[in-house]
Structure formats: C-alpha cells, structure tokens
Design a protein with these regions (language model features):
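TPR/TPR-like (Sel1-like) alpha-helical repeat modules
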Residues: 302-325
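Acidic, proline/glycine-rich low-complexity intrinsically disordered segments
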Residues: 1-275, 279-282, 289, 294-303
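A generic structural signal for well-ordered alpha-helical surface patches
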Residues: 295, 312-315, 351
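Terminal, low-structured helical/coil segments at or just beyond the last alpha-helical repeat
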Residues: 329-365
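Short, compositionally biased low-complexity segments
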Residues: 52-53, 147, 321-330
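Acidic, Ser/Thr-rich low-complexity linear motifs
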Residues: 94-97, 159-161, 323-341
C-alpha cells in the first residue's frame, strides 16, 4: 500500500481543498481526515475515511478518552484507526469492478470474504479466491499465508472437512514456504501459530503469536489467537486481559464476538456463571449467526437454572450448524480441532461446560 508521508499530509492541514483535488495532486485513492479537541483532561478524536475519486464517506469514528499517558493514548488511537481502516479498505477495494483481476485483486476479494459472517460458504469462497491468487502468482507470500490461514480456519477449527489431516498438512507446508520467503512477516507468524495450535502444540503456538505481536502490536487476530491458546494451555488468568486489549484496539471488528465469547468462557470455567452469561450474550449479539455462541449460552443458562432458555439456545445452535456436531456430547468431544486443550483445561470444560450442556438436554451419545 502506498501511503503519503506525514509531512506532506500536514501541509494540507490549513488549506480549504476538496478531497478529490487532494487525491489527484497526491495520486491517492483514499483520504483520512480528522481533528482533535480538548476539554480539560478529556480528548475527542474524530476521523473519517473518504474515497477521493467519488467523495463518498466510507467510514467515520469518534473516540473520547482521558489524556493520561499521551504515548499510550497515541498507540491506542493509532491501533483503533489502523484496524478499522484495514477492514474498510479491504471491503472497498474488493468491491471495485475489475474485468482482468490479478493476484492482488483475488487476495483482496478473499480477505473481503473472510470479513463476511463466518459460514461454510464464506470460508469456501475465500479458499477459492486465494487459490486463484496463488495460481496467478506462485511466489506470493500473501496468497500462501491467506490460503494457509483459511484452510486451518475452515477445515480444522470448524470441522467441516473429512480431510482434516491432509488440509492441516497442506496449511503447514504453505506457511513454512511463506515464512522462508518472509521470516519477519507478522501475519505469517500468526498463521503459523494457528497451524501449530491446531496440532495441539500450544506452547509453540504461543511463541508464534507473541512473535507476530512483537512485529505488529496492532494485529488483533494474534491477540485473539494468543488468548485462546493461553486458555487451552491452562493459563486462564491471562486470557481476559488479552481479549480486552483486542476489543479496545478494534471495537467494531467482525470477530469481536469471538473475543467476548472467550471472556465468557473464562468466567464459566471459573464458576462465575452470571458473568459468563453477560459476555456470552454480548457474543451472541455481535455474531448471532455463529452456532457456538448459542451453544455457550445453552450451557451457561442451564448452569444458572434457566432450563427454558438453555433448551432454546441449544435448539438454535443445532439449527444454525445444520449437521451432527451438536447432536451429542460424544460428537462435540470428537470435534476435529484443538478446542479442549491441555488436561487442566479439559477437566474444567468437563465440570462446567459439558455439565451445562448435559443439563440443557444434550445426550451423551
């Protein structure tokens, strides 16, 4: 991505010039503009993203915060805007008509597909687009990394393939190749973390996520991966701060419901059922299409004694899944992914999560 330098951008600060002219003069497609206002110890930061070709406003956000530590405040504002822009620019670029797409176009379209509500269809669409990108450019590190990450997400973590081992092996080979070409690429280290986490190698996955974050602290997917991996590895007390950091950095992220759900799971496994319900309900509100958000609520409601709502949520989870995954405890435990963690975490799942699902009416076999 071509980004104009700060000094050049500042030169337009006091000029009454339209965004279309700025775009033409600088040769840029998008303009980010904003302002900062102070009232006592409070700051209000306003920002908006504008398409310089059409003058259309694509995104806007207002952040209110205490001055406090100015350096920490600057980092948080930068992170939130960067994550929001990443989402908006991917969607905007992918929507542009192009009769002769190249590898980068297919990568953008694939990433846009990943921003859609998660489903077998959206994952399959993304895989197809990343495959096209890689076919057009076999040396593309981005195509290999995105394809590997999507293979892990769909075929392993979501249990939608009978070829889990083969797809995991393919993802492993792709990400090894990508990292050999770009050993400091943060997103590739994140995907490597996803791969080794799917292999049950939690400590190795933690190293990869931390490497990704050291290179790019704004990579919120790595915060999510690190948080869940800490949960699986048994370091439960470290999970909530990581997820709260992800929420602060990207509060409108399509994956924010996953982060809410992780915090809810921590509360459930530590027998704070009322708090778990609060966070699981936030997760359901953010992503009502995800069956596991309803499944988590089914367990939590049952543990709280609200069997009527527990039964309703279990039925909704099964309806959304459309398969046999949620038909029994045995099917759920056989889920082809690294969800139940190390022995300490598995024991907590058994005494809390699975106990709740049994109360909600999920049979053993």
């Amino acid at each position: 991505m071509f980004v104009i330098s700060r000094n050049t951008a500042f030169s337009y600060g006091n000029k009454r010039i339209g965004t279309s002219r700025i775009g033409r003069e600088l040769g840029v497609r998008y303009v980010l503009e904003g302002c900062i206002r102070r009232s006592g110890n409070r700051l209000r930061v306003s920002a908006q993203l504008i398409d310089a070709e059409t003058d259309a406003h694509l995104w806007a956000e207002r952040l209110d915060c205490d001055i406090g530590d100015l350096f920490a405040l600057q980092d948080e504002i930068t992170s939130r805007i960067a994550n929001a822009l990443n989402i908006e620019l991917i969607a905007a670029e992918a929507a542009r008509p192009n009769e002769h797409p190249d590898a980068f176009d297919y990568i953008l379209r694939g990433r846009a597909a990943r921003l859609k509500p998660e489903s077998r269809g959206s994952f399959a669409e993304a895989i197809s687009l990343f495959e096209c990108a890689w076919t057009l450019d076999p040396q593309s590190v981005e195509a290999q990394t995105c394809l590997a990450g999507t293979l892990v997400g769909l075929r392993v973590f979501y249990g939608t393939s009978d070829l889990v081992a083969a797809n995991l092996a393919r993802a492993d080979a792709l990400i090894r190749r990508a990292l050999a070409a770009a050993p400091r690429y943060a997103f590739a280290h994140y995907v490597k973390g996803q791969v080794v986490r799917a292999q049950g190698r939690y400590e190795d996955a933690i190293v990869e996520y931390e490497t990704a974050l050291a290179s790019n602290p704004n990579l919120v997917v790595a915060l999510n991966g690190l948080g869940w991996c800490k949960l699986f590895a048994g370091s439960i007390d470290e999970v909530t701060p990581l997820m709260q950091q992800a929420i602060r950095r990207s509060p409108e992220d399509p994956q924010v419901g996953v982060w809410h759900g992780a915090i809810g799971m921590v509360h459930m496994l530590q027998s704070r059922i009322d708090e778990a319900i609060v966070w699981f309900e936030k997760a359901r509100s953010a992503s009502p299409e995800k069956p596991y958000n309803h499944l988590h609520l089914a367990a939590a409601y049952a543990l709280s004694g609200d069997l009527e709502r527990a039964v309703m949520e279990l039925a909704e989870a099964r309806r959304l899944d459309g398969g046999t995954l949620y038909s029994s405890i045995a099917h759920l435990k056989a889920f082809p992914g690294p969800w139940w963690g190390a022995p300490k975490t598995r024991s907590l799942y058994e005494t809390a999560y699975f106990a709740g699902l049994r109360k909600a009416g999920m049979p053993e076999e």
